[in-house]
Amino acid sequence: MNRYSNAFARLKAGSRGAFVPFVTLGDPGIDESLAIIDALVEGGADCLELGFPFSDPLADGPVIQGANIRALAAGTTPDTCFKMIEQIRAKYPELPIGLLLYANLVFANGIEAFYQRAKAAGVDSVLIADVPAEESAPFVAAARAEGIAPIFIAPPNASADTLRLVASLGEGYTYLLSRAGVTGADNKAGMPLDSVLSALKEFNAPPPLLGFGIAEPSQVQEAIAAGAAGAISGSAVVKRIEALKDDMPKLLTELKSFASAMKAAT
């Protein structure tokens, strides 16, 4: 059993879903970023989804682009990110840790080397935002060689063939998009996703987590009621970081209570 299957089994036994926050590592600074992750875990996060800062994030709206800019300005590099993950893993040995990043960062030092480094740091899964399932073979092979779960996006308008492929290649969880477009809490999650969820179930896909535009507890409740195994919230977390980055005590209190409210909705 890996950390994801353990986490989902534990949640299922308690009739709960997963709350998964996303943050960009190093935003607004390295020490602050580690404190933010502690606050989210203390608030009840079941898994973490972590981004490496990147200068040209295609799928991200302005909020997460701002996080990338702040993290890069703080001197965050991929090497820094792996060192941070080692610290997070040492502190939370059972917590599933996923990476959400772009192919350029994986290619930079060679695909195999990237996954080896990720495994050594304690990473459980990798989602490459700009590599569709159809083009993922070298990434999947490198991930599986290291025992890392390759994660795939299931878009709301996907064909049955795409969903079948996502289900067969993916491990850990399935990233279910609530809508097409760029990320952002202002672009509220759109339901219904019943047809996508039932297709994923039919194809035995890993547990679906709904992402994109998840900003409030009611949306978490809706996602789980629709059949998702949980929800991922990124822009809503990063918005709070942006607003309160100059008042860390207030920010950490706010993030912990946000995570608690989102978790309570599962």
From Swiss-Prot:
Species lineage: Bacteria, Pseudomonadati, Pseudomonadota, Gammaproteobacteria, Alteromonadales
Lyase found in the keyword field: yes
Alphabetized UniProt keyword annotations: Amino-acid biosynthesis, Aromatic amino acid biosynthesis, Lyase, Tryptophan biosynthesis
HAMAP family on file: Trp_synth_alpha
InterPro entries per UniProt: Aldolase_TIM, RibuloseP-bd_barrel, Trp_synthase_alpha_AS, Trp_synthase_suA
EC number from the UniProt entry: 4.2.1.20
GO cellular component: cytosol
Keyword Amino-acid biosynthesis belongs to the record: yes
Pathway: Amino-acid biosynthesis; L-tryptophan biosynthesis; L-tryptophan from chorismate: step 5/5
Any Pfam family the entry gives: Trp_syntA
Active-site feature positions: E49, D60
GO molecular function, one term: tryptophan synthase activity
Subunit organization: Tetramer of two alpha and two beta chains.
Function: The alpha subunit is responsible for the aldol cleavage of indoleglycerol phosphate to indole and glyceraldehyde 3-phosphate.
Protein name: Tryptophan synthase alpha chain
Catalytic activity: (1S,2R)-1-C-(indol-3-yl)glycerol 3-phosphate + L-serine = D-glyceraldehyde 3-phosphate + L-tryptophan + H2O
PROSITE patterns in alphabetical order: TRP_SYNTHASE_ALPHA
Family from the record: Belongs to the TrpA family.
Species assigned in the record: Shewanella amazonensis (strain ATCC BAA-1098 / SB2B)
